[in-house]
Amino acid sequence: MHQYRRFSAPPALLGATLMAALAPASAQVAPAALAECAAIAADNDRLACFDRLSGRPARPAVAPRQDAAAPAPGTGAAAAAAPAAAAAPAGSESMFDKAWGFDPSSSRYGLSPYGANYLLVGRYTNDVNMAVYQPLFDSGLFKPGTTIDSTEAAFQLSFKFRLWTTDDRRWGLWAAYTQQSQWQVYNDSGNASRPFRETNYMPELILSYRPGTQWGDWKWNLATLALNHQSNGRSDVLSRSWNRVIGGVGVENGNFALLGRLWWRIPESSDSDDNPTISDYYGWGDLSAIYKWRDNSFAATIRGNPSTGKGAGQLSWTSAPLLGPLRGYVKLFSGYGETMIDYNWKQTTIGVGVTLNDWL
C-alpha cells in the first residue's frame, strides 16, 4: 500500500502564482471600468463605482441633504419678530418720539430739553418800551439820563423731567420749567448798572400721549395737555402773570413737523388780575412748524386772537453744530408779547447767539 505525502507550497509562491494568472484579465478590464467610473457626473454614484472596482461593499445610500425651507410669511422667526416691531413706536427717526421719550427703551425718569436753551449775545428792538417803566422814573428810582438800551442780551433755560410713564412709554407725566431773561448788559447810562430788564418764569405740568396714527405720509405722534403758569415775579405796576390750560397736537412727515396748541385762561378776580387784556394781545393759541435740513433747523411760529387781530410771529434758524453741542442761533420776532412786560407792546426784534438744542 502506497502512502502519498501531502505537498504544501510556500504562501509567497502561491500568491505570486495567482497574481500572474489574474494579471492579463485585470489589464484588459481595469482601464475600461475606470473610464466608465470617471465619466459619472454625480459625486455619490462615481464614488460607489470606484468602491465596486476595489472590492469594497457598497455603502448604504444617504439621502441628499436638503436645506431647511424658508418659513412662510407670518411664521417662524419672522412671526416672532413681528410683535416686538409692533410694540416699538413707528418711525425710529420721529422728532416727537425723540423729544418726548416715546421709545420703550428710553429712561423712565429722564431729564431732557423742553424749549430751546439759548444765549443771544445781541438782541435789538426797533421800539423800546419806555412807557411801562415810566412810574419808576417818576418815583425818582432812576437818575435823570437813565435810559433803556435798544440792544441787550437775552437767554433762555428750558427743560422737562418725566415723573411717571407707562411701560410702553405711550403715556407720560412731566414737570417742565422755562425761564427767559432780558439783560441790559450794555447799558451803563445814569444809574442803570446793567440791570435785568425782565425775567419770565414758566413752570408746567404736562400729560403726554403718543396716538401713533397715520394718514398717508403724515404721522400723528404727539398729544399733550398742560397746566401752565407764567409770571415775571414782580410786584405793583410791573407785575404780570396768568394761568392757562393748554392742549397740543403734533404731526410730522419725515423732517417736517407741525405743532398746534390752543389754550384757555383760568379766570382771576378783577382785584388780583394784573393784565386783564393779555389774551387780546397774546392770543388763544399758536401754530409752529419746523423743518430740518442737513443738520440745520428752520422754525416758524404764529399766534394770535382772531377777534382783535393782534398776535405775533417768530422765525428762527438753528445751525449745524459749531463747537461740541453749541449751534448758531438767529431769532426774528414781530408783534405783541415777546415778554410778559411787553404783552401789549408791539415791536420787531432780532437776536443772534448760540443754542444747545432746538425746541424739537
Regions found by a protein language model. Name each.
Residues G285-T339, D358:
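Long, repeat-rich segments with strong aromatic
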Residues L22-S26:
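N-terminal signal peptide c-region/cleavage motif recognized by signal peptidases
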